[in-house]
A protein has these predicted regions:
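C-terminal accessory/tail domains of diverse enzymes
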Residues: 1-31, 76-77, 146, 186, ...
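DNA replication initiation on ssDNA origins
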Residues: 1-85, 163, 171, 190
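Conserved short beta-strand edge segments in small beta-sheet-based binding/regulatory domains
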Residues: 56-62, 150-159
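Secondary-structure capping and boundary motifs in well-ordered enzyme cores
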Residues: 76-80, 106, 114-115
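Modules that initiate DNA replication and primer synthesis
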Residues: 84-85, 89-100, 104-106, 118-147, ...
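A common structural junction motif
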Residues: 106-109, 146-156
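Short beta-strand
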Residues: 111-118, 155-160
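Polar, glycine-rich mid-to-C-terminal structural blocks
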Residues: 176-202
Length: 230
């Protein structure tokens, strides 16, 4: 199998990286992991020889200039500076080997569906970037992504805004022989308002507040007296 990046992927990146400054590829083998950082306007080339021996991922959401852009740093939530999509993953093993078919039943329909070799990654593209200038904005969009994932029934482990996902055209070396990552559905003009997607979600849970707390330092007799008065 000859891996080759699907050229449509770069059109997707143009949408996903709006409002950001940096991004990175994340490459791994059985013995090493490394990041390849670059400006969002100039994605780094990926040699075919690399694709033949490494799993390749990319940062779904763009990152700010404050991110640690060293070769061994993989971006985290605090590095994200804008969000242009909500995502969810569905594993083939959970859908009788046909997560692609399940993705076709989702409402609202995903804008893009990419088969990773073991399941599908679904993207609901936003019409405008959600900018992340501070912690409250970051906390809000991170919460929406987690709640969206629960609402749509996606895999529990794929619900963070710093997610890296597989690049279409690359190979998935978790399997032998390796499986190619492919695009299953492609609708870059299928855009959603974040407010409309958020309106589909159940209300965020409200943390319950308990009654008066009993100090741990109270004597046993004091605790007994308190219990008798209850």
């Amino acid at each position: 199998m000859n891996p080759e990046i699907d050229v449509r992927f770069y059109d997707l990146l143009t949408h996903l990286w709006r409002g950001g400054q940096y991004a990175h590829w994340w490459a791994k083998t059985s013995t090493s992991k490394q990041s390849m950082w670059f400006a969002t306007s100039q994605p780094a080339d990926i040699a075919v020889s690399w694709l033949k021996q490494m799993d390749f991922y990319y940062t779904v959401n763009p990152l700010g200039s404050h991110a640690d852009r060293s070769v061994h740093h993989k971006s985290g939530n605090d590095d994200v500076i804008a969000v242009n999509t909500l995502i969810a993953e569905f594993d083939d093993k959970d859908y009788a080997g046909n997560a692609t078919g399940h993705a076709q039943t989702l409402t609202p329909a995903p804008s893009v569906v990419i088969h990773s070799g073991g399941g599908v990654h679904c993207y609901w593209l936003l019409d405008t970037p959600y900018l992340v200038p501070d912690r409250p904005a970051r906390a809000r969009i991170a919460d929406i992504e987690k709640r969206w994932n629960t609402y749509i029934g996606g895999s529990v482990g794929v619900n963070d805004i710093a997610r890296v996902l597989r690049i279409p055209g690359s190979l998935n070396f978790k399997y032998s022989p390796a499986r190619q990552v492919t695009i299953c559905a492609w609708h870059l003009d299928r855009l959603y308002r974040l407010a409309d997607l958020e309106a589909l979600l159940p209300p965020a849970p409200v943390l319950a507040t308990g009654g008066p707390r009993v100090p741990n330092s109270m004597a046993d007799q004091d605790l007994l007296d308190l219990a008798r008065k209850a």
